[in-house]
């Protein structure tokens, strides 16, 4: 099986609507990550690359032309990603490496119909879950047309075609294309641009385990949800299994995560420092076979945690609503800074160890069940 925790190179997507500050952010983020000991590699925006070299979308008027254009972006993007990752892994072994991508493969979904995107996947024998979730993180920078309209322009990108209204529409479409990714962060325009970059770096730091201040969400026990008012969303099925650990300061778990019959598998090791209540979390993609082998090492004091996660966007925020199954049936938990109007809360459970995933995995006694009633 090998050392499952050695990640040869991390891939982080920087996406967003037109004029969101992606290109301007890349230089700053590259410098900051380099300061923290990472070798940083940047994959430029494929659409801009081919548009600036003659394949101009402004000359395309038919749906078939647009689909072929997006297919070209899809294939080039995938080739860039695989080539970069394979090459830097071989050339720079043993180094901390991160690839920053100016857009990722799922951005294509925002510019074609659902049927056309599914056809692109079928022709290549690919599935959406595998493509979306293989990145370590996705950072969505909101277009300046949403909250900073005075800064919306095409000066930094000659390939930019969109009006502010179109930019808003594309921005929302791109966000929805990434719904369901396990590490998806939205960076809005509530601060100046310098503050926006700092928040983007903080989000990346959290993904890469770089010590930094992170504004944490509260956790709420949900009383009721008006599902008729739920915005566009993705339903994700998650199974988590805690394994036997050699050290009490360490938690090891495996996770099955996916939808529509397609799944990815992860192994996570969480190292806890009880003195300052901090922790470092390492996560690695594993194969389905490795998952089934490792699940035989389940901690005998625990059971499998099953939940359905609903991922949705509301007021420029990304939400994950977890409804638990099995021994935790009836428990629904929301992590958020601000609670959507269509969700009613039973109580704030921030910091309550009873509702930690580790504790919810514990096998329940008859007394536990009576207390939950």
Annotated model-derived regions:
Residues 111, 115-176:
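A glycine- and Lys/Arg-enriched "phosphate-lid" helix/loop adjacent to the NTP-binding pocket
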Residues 14:
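Hydrophobic anchor at the beta1->P-loop junction of P-loop NTPases
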Residues 30-76:
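Conserved substrate/cofactor phosphate-moiety recognition/catalytic segment
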Residues 71-132:
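Glycine-rich phosphate-binding loop used to anchor ATP phosphates in small-molecule kinases
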Residues 194-195, 201-373:
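Phosphate-end processing signature that detects enzymes handling 5′-triphosphorylated RNA
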Residues 25:
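Hydrophobic positions on the alpha1 helix immediately C-terminal to the Walker A/P-loop
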């Amino acid at each position: 099986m090998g050392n499952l925790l050695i990640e040869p190179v991390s891939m982080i997507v920087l996406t967003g609507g037109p004029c969101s500050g992606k290109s301007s952010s890349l230089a700053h983020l590259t410098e900051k990550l380099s300061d923290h000991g990472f070798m940083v590699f940047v994959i430029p925006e494929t659409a801009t690359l081919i548009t600036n070299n003659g394949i101009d979308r402004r000359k395309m008027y038919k749906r078939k032309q647009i689909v072929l254009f997006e297919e070209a972006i899809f294939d080039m993007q995938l080739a860039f990603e695989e080539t970069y990752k394979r090459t830097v892994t071989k050339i720079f072994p043993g180094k901390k490496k991160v690839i920053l991508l100016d857009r990722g493969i799922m951005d294509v979904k925002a510019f074609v119909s659902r049927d056309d995107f599914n056809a692109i996947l079928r022709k290549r024998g690919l599935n959406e879950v595998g493509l979306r979730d293989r990145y370590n993180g996705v950072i969505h920078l909101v277009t300046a047309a949403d909250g900073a309209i005075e800064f919306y322009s095409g000066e930094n990108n000659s390939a930019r075609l969109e009006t502010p209204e179109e930019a808003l529409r594309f921005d929302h479409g791109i966000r929805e294309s990434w719904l369901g990714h396990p590490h998806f962060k939205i960076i809005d325009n509530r601060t100046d641009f310098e503050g926006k970059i700092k928040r983007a770096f903080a989000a990346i730091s959290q993904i890469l385990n770089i010590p930094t201040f992170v504004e944490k969400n509260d956790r709420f026990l949900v009383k009721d949800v008006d599902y008729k008012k739920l915005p566009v969303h993705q339903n994700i099925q998650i199974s988590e299994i805690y394994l036997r650990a050699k050290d009490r300061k360490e938690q090891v778990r495996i996770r099955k995560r996916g939808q529509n019959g397609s799944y990815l598998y992860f192994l996570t090791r969480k190292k806890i420092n009880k003195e300052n209540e901090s922790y470092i979390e390492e996560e690695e993609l594993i194969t389905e076979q490795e998952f089934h082998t490792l699940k035989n090492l389940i901690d005998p004091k625990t059971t499998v945690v099953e939940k359905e996660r609903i991922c949705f966007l509301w007021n420029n925020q990304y939400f994950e609503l977890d409804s638990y199954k099995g021994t935790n049936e009836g428990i629904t938990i929301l992590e958020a800074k601000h609670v959507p109007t269509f969700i009613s809360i039973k109580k704030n459970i921030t910091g309550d160890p009873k509702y930690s995933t580790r504790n919810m995995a514990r096998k329940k006694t008859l007394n536990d069940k009576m207390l939950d009633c």
